[in-house]
Structure formats: C-alpha cells, structure tokens
A protein has these predicted regions:
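Hydrophobic, gly/ala-rich membrane-insertion helices/peptides used by toxins and envelope proteins
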Residues: 306-370
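A short acidic/small-residue loop/turn micro-motif
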Residues: 9, 32-35, 60-61, 78-81, ...
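Polybasic, low-complexity binding patches
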Residues: 277, 301-310
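A motif-centric feature for acidic-aromatic and gly/ser/thr-rich catalytic loops and repeats
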Residues: 48, 54, 58, 62-64, ...
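A cytosolic small-molecule/anion-sensing beta-strand core signal
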Residues: 93, 115, 140, 205, ...
Length: 370
C-alpha cells in the first residue's frame, strides 16, 4: 500500500506499507521528497499471537518480552551494541499495567486504577521524590469527565460520546467543539480572557489532526505521527488541543491517548489494560487483550478502545452532506452561502456552566449542510 502526503514545504513524503499474511504491519518505507528522496525504513516483527517482538527504525532497535498472559514485561532499546534504555513493566491481578520502571534513569511511572479498572492517577518517582502528574474522574457511563494535570483542571461535557465543550476549575467554559455527524471534531472555539479564537481542524484519512488552522489561515500547531501514533507537535499550540491521533484525546503529560474505554500507549503499540470485549471466535486477531488495531494501525482505528474499525475511504473533512456546523463558526469560516443550510436547533442544560463570570444555559446547535 502506498500513500502520499504533501503540505506545502512542510511535508512532502511517500510511504509504502508492507503486511504479513495476517494483515499485520511489518514494514514502512518513507521517502522524504524535500531531502533528495531520502528514505527511512521501520520494520516490525511479532510472535504467533501478535505481541510485538522487535521494532527497528534503522537507528535504534527495541526488543520486547512478555509473560504467559501476553503482558509486556520488558522493552530494551539499543543503538548498535549499546543499550540506551531498559524498561520493566508490572501488572495487578486484574491485568492493569501498574508500573513502568526505567532502569537506566531510575524513573518510575505508576498507574492507579479505580474499582472499575479505569485509570485514576498517574505519578512519577525519581530520586526518591514522587509527583502526581495526572488525576482522572469518570461518570457512570465510563466517560472521563475531569482531568487534573498538575494545577490545571479540565472538565469534559459530552454530546453523543464526543467532547462537546470543556470548563476549567471555576466552571468557566473555555472551549466548544464543532462535531460532525460521524463524531468527528471539525472545528473548535477557545475562550480566553474575554477573547474568542476559532480554529479549524485539518485531518488525514485516519482522522488524525495534521494541523490546527486559525482564522487568518495560519497554523496554530502542526502534528506528525509514527505508524502507531507517537505524536510530535510543532508550533505555539495556543489552543491546547488534545484531539490528535485518529481523533483520540492526547494527554501530553503522560504520553497516553484516552480512547474512551481504555488508555493507549503509542510508544509500545499497546493498551494499558485488558479489553473487556473478548473478541470473536472466528476472528483470532480480535482476541488479543492488549494490542492496538490487530497491529494494523494504517488501515484501522479504535475510537472506542474495544476493537479495530476499518477506515472509510473518502471520509475526509469537506463540505459534504451531513456535516454539523455551528452557526457562529460557519459564518467565521465563510461557509454561509456555500450550500443550502437547514438549521436543526436543540437545547439542553448542564449545571454551573459559566462564561466570563456569567452562569448560562448550554445551547447545542446542530446545522446540517445539505
């Protein structure tokens, strides 16, 4: 499979993917047309049940070991014959990853879970000092409704399973998302110090954010990803955007992705916890409890955290039928008059939502482009 990506002078590359007979990604060759067609090759090897045994990017090689429950036990990164990093992993009786110890740096990252096996706290210990870097709270449906990163609190409010808007520790609304009918976040408003900034998401075919564009057409931030979603953000990122790889919520403080049912570690290509969905008997690749998208992250995404979903060709952002556009943002992005617009307005109320110190009712607007 071959894909080509081109974004002015920023990205101009071609990727060629190779798979084994089980459909698992085993090689990616990237040709950078900006640098005299220089190529970079990354290869992956797996065991019979789908555990990644080795990743080789031409510069470093990372090897992995597992226990009998397919739980990751060690990862060793080598450059030539020199060992650069060794990590050791531990799990609790429920199959939740609880500790990641870097034996070279002495840093230990600890995960704590609630009674429903949901990640509730992440802390880091180094040189005998422990710091809590993240705390999470969930509602009865299992959705994360609050995240505390250091001294910054974010409260999440959902529409049909997708984050519609957020508030800060004082209940002040600081964002409002524009959501498509397929649950795709198309644009967003950010409220900061009595000012409003509008942003439009540019996304690739996987639904991953490639750039966040301001009203003047300039990019607030650009995003690049490895095959399994390791994320590099360049730019100011004034919007503090979290919607990144395949539309998942990226927690920069932990390096993890919140994919609703579970948290995903793109560096290892695995989830931290077992999947409560045990897969289908006639589809063995769905029965692994930890691996991401059956080791085929190019053609599949996992928005629920429960299993791979095939990518629909042609599912890119555009003025197509059925997209949801908020009135204010639609006008700001000069969509008025582009298509016949039918307004379908719904109202609903949430508790203590405030903007600029004033309590207000949340109004959910849905505008369908026909």
């Amino acid at each position: 499979m071959t894909t080509t990506k081109e974004d002015a002078d920023k990205v101009n590359e071609t990727k060629v993917y190779t798979y084994d007979t089980l459909g698992r990604l085993i090689k990616t060759v990237t040709t950078d047309h900006r640098k005299d067609d220089k190529t970079k090759t990354v290869t992956y090897t797996y065991d019979n049940v789908g555990n990644r045994l080795k990743e080789d990017n031409g510069t470093t090689t990372t090897s992995y070991t597992y226990n009998g429950l397919d739980q990751l036990k060690t990862s060793t990164k080598e450059k030539g014959t020199a060992v650069e990093e060794v990590r050791q992993y531990d799990y609790d009786a429920n199959g939740n990853q609880t500790d990641v110890k870097n034996t070279k740096t002495g840093e230990n990252q600890t995960y704590v879970y609630d009674a429903e096996n949901r990640l509730s706290q992440v802390s880091v210990t180094k040189d005998g000092k422990t710091a809590v870097i993240q705390q999470n709270i969930y509602n009865g449906e299992g959705q994360r409704i609050q995240k505390v990163d250091g001294d910054e609190m974010t409260n999440y409010y959902y529409q049909d399973g997708v984050v519609a808007y957020t508030t800060d520790a004082n209940g002040e609304q600081n964002s409002q998302n524009l959501i498509g009918t397929d649950g795709n976040v198309l644009a967003t408003e950010r409220f900061q110090q009595n000012a409003t900034q509008y942003y439009l998401y540019n996304k690739d075919i996987q639904g991953s954010t490639s750039s966040l564009v301001k009203e003047d057409g300039s990019a607030d931030a650009t995003y690049q990803y490895t095959d399994f979603g390791e994320t590099t953000i360049q730019g100011d990122d004034q919007a503090k955007n979290e919607v990144s790889y395949t539309g998942g919520i990226y927690d920069q403080s932990t390096g993890l992705y919140y994919l609703n049912a579970r948290y995903y570690n793109p560096e290892d290509g695995r989830f931290l916890t077992e999947d409560t969905y045990r897969g289908e008997n006639n589809q063995p690749n769905t029965q692994h409890l930890y691996v991401y998208c059956a080791n085929n992250p190019v053609n599949y995404v996992d928005p629920s955290g429960h299993g791979p979903v095939g990518i629909v060709i042609g599912g890119l952002i555009g003025y197509g039928a059925g997209k949801l556009i908020l009135p204010k943002i639609a006008n700001r992005l000069h969509l008025k008059g582009k298509k016949k617009v039918v307004y379908k307005i719904r109202y609903r109320c949430n508790n203590s939502v405030r903007r600029n110190g004033r309590k207000l009712f949340w109004r959910s607007y849905s505008i369908y482009l026909c």
